C-alpha cells in the first residue's frame, strides 16, 4: 500500500491498524535542538483520545505515546523520530458479523476490491484510529512552529447538524467536551448527541482550523501551492468530504470588489482569501473549514451485500462516535501544522536570504 506519507522536508509516515498490536509513525526532517518530551505529545493525544466523554466512542485507549528514536536528552537530534502507541482495548468479536459483509458507507467494499483482502476488525487501516499518530507527529510540528516562529494553530467545532455557533471565544474551547467556542451552544450540542444515541444514528459536523502568525511567503507554486497542500492534508482525514480555504464556496455569491482584500500600510483590510494568495501565505491568519460526514457505524439497519454479492442487511456493532467531528478537532490542527511546518522548512531552504524593499504588512 502506497500513500502512507505526507510532506517533503518535514515528512510523516504512519503505520498500523485499528485492532493491530500497535500504531506507529516515523517523522523525518525535524530540525535538531527542539526540546520535546512524550508529555508534549500526550497533551494533544489526550484531546483526541477515545472514551474521554459520553459523547464519543467508549473504546478506552490510553494512547500513551513512546518516543523510540530521534530524541536525546530531551532534544531532537535531527534524525528520524520514531513514535509508537500500543492498542490495548481492541474488541474484535464485535466485528465478526461483518467478516463476509460490507458496511455501507465504509471502506470495506473498496478495500476488498482494491487489495483482494481486508482486515475487517474495526476497519483495519481505514479506521480513524490511525489518526492518533498524525496527532502525535502534528504535536511536534506545533511545538516547533510556536517555539521558533510564534505560529499557533487552533481549531474548534463550529457546527453539528443544524446547530451552528454564533460567536468564537478561544478560551472556551477547552472548557467543554465538544471543543465548542460558544458556551451558549454546548447544551444544544449535548441534547443533539443524546437524541442521536436514542435513535442509534449519527450526524455530520463542521470544523474551523486557524493558523496565526504565519510568515509571509510560504507555498511552492504551481502544483505545491500552500492551499492545495492544506486541502490535500485535510481531505486525507477520515470522513472529511469538503474543504474550504477562506470564504470557500461563499465566493460564488461575492463580487470582485467585495472579495478582494485591500492593502494599506497598516495591513490588509479583510481576509476573504484565508491568508493565502497565489498559493503563497500573505502573513494573515490561515483559515480553513472542513465538513465531516456522519459516520455509517450506526445501529439503524442498512442494505448491503455479502462478499459473494448476495443482498443482506447490516446493523453495525461495536463502539463508535455519534459525531466524528468532535474528536477530529485536534486531528485538523495536526494536519495543518504538518503542512505549515513542511512549507516553512522548504521556504527556508530556498528563500532564506531573499529580501525586498517592500515592508511586510
Swiss-Prot record:
Keyword check for NADP: yes
InterPro entries: Chorismate_synth, Chorismate_synth_AroC_sf, Chorismate_synthase_CS
Cofactors demanded by this protein: FMNH2
PROSITE patterns hit by this protein: CHORISMATE_SYNTHASE_1, CHORISMATE_SYNTHASE_2, CHORISMATE_SYNTHASE_3
A cellular component term, taken from the record's GO annotations: cytosol
GO molecular function (one): chorismate synthase activity
Any one of the GO BP annotations: chorismate biosynthetic process
Listed pathway(s): Metabolic intermediate biosynthesis; chorismate biosynthesis; chorismate from D-erythrose 4-phosphate and phosphoenolpyruvate: step 7/7
Cofactor notes: Reduced FMN (FMNH(2)).
Residues where FMN binds: 125-127, 238-239, 278, 293-297, 319
EC supergroup of this enzyme: lyase
Residue sites binding NADP(+) per the record: 48, 54
Enzyme Commission number, as recorded: 4.2.3.5
Superkingdom classification of source: Bacteria
Gene3D superfamilies: Chorismate synthase AroC
Catalytically driven reaction(s): 5-O-(1-carboxyvinyl)-3-phosphoshikimate = chorismate + phosphate
Assigned keywords, A-Z: Amino-acid biosynthesis, Aromatic amino acid biosynthesis, FAD, Flavoprotein, FMN, Lyase, NADP
SUBUNIT field: Homotetramer.
Similarity remark: Belongs to the chorismate synthase family.
General function of this protein: This reaction introduces a second double bond into the aromatic ring system.
Name this polypeptide is given: Chorismate synthase
Gene: aroC
Amino acid at each position: 500500500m502506497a500513500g502512507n506519507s505526507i510532506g517533503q522536508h518535514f515528512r510523516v509516515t504512519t503505520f498500523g491498524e485499528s485492532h493491530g498490536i500497535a500504531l506507529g509513525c516515523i517523522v523525518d526532517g525535524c530540525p535538531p535542538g527542539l526540546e520535546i518530551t512524550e508529555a508534549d505529545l500526550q497533551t494533544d493525544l489526550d484531546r483526541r483520545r477515545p472514551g474521554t466523554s459520553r459523547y464519543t466512542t467508549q473504546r478506552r485507549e490510553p494512547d500513551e505515546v513512546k518516543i523510540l528514536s530521534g530524541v536525546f536528552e530531551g532534544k531532537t537530534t535531527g534524525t528520524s523520530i520514531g513514535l509508537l502507541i500500543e492498542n490495548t482495548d481492541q474488541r474484535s468479536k464485535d466485528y465478526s458479523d461483518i467478516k463476509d459483509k460490507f458496511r455501507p458507507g465504509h471502506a470495506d467494499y473498496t478495500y476488498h476490491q482494491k487489495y483482494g483482502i481486508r482486515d475487517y476488525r474495526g476497519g483495519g487501516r481505514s479506521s480513524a484510529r490511525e489518526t492518533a499518530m498524525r496527532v502525535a507527529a502534528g504535536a511536534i510540528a506545533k511545538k516547533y512552529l510556536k517555539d521558533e516562529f510564534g505560529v499557533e494553530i487552533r481549531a474548534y467545532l463550529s457546527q453539528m447538524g443544524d446547530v451552528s455557533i454564533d460567536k468564537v471565544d478561544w478560551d472556551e474551547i477547552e472548557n467543554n467536551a465538544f471543543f465548542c467556542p460558544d458556551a451558549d451552544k454546548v447544551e444544544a450540542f449535548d441534547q443533539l448527541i443524546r437524541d442521536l444515541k436514542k435513535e442509534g444514528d449519527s450526524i455530520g459536523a463542521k470544523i474551523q482550523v486557524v493558523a496565526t502568525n504565519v510568515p509571509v511567503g510560504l507555498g511552492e507554486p504551481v502544483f505545491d501551492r500552500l492551499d492545495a497542500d492544506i486541502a490535500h492534508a485535510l481531505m486525507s482525514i477520515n470522513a472529511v468530504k469538503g474543504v474550504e480555504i477562506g470564504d470557500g464556496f461563499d465566493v460564488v455569491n461575492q463580487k470582485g470588489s467585495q472579495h478582494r482584500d485591500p492593502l494599506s500600510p497598516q495591513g490588509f483590510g479583510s481576509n476573504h482569501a484565508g491568508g493565502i494568495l497565489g498559493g503563497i501565505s500573505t502573513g494573515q491568519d490561515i483559515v480553513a473549514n472542513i465538513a465531516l460526514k456522519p459516520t455509517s457505524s450506526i445501529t439503524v439497519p442498512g442494505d448491503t451485500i455479502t462478499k459473494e454479492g448476495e443482498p443482506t442487511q447490516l446493523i453495525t456493532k461495536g463502539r463508535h462516535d455519534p459525531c466524528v467531528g468532535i474528536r477530529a478537532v485536534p486531528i485538523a490542527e495536526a494536519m495543518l501544522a504538518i503542512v505549515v511546518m513542511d512549507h516553512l522548512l522548504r521556504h527556508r531552504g530556498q528563500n532564506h536570504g531573499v529580501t525586498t524593499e517592500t515592508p511586510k504588512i
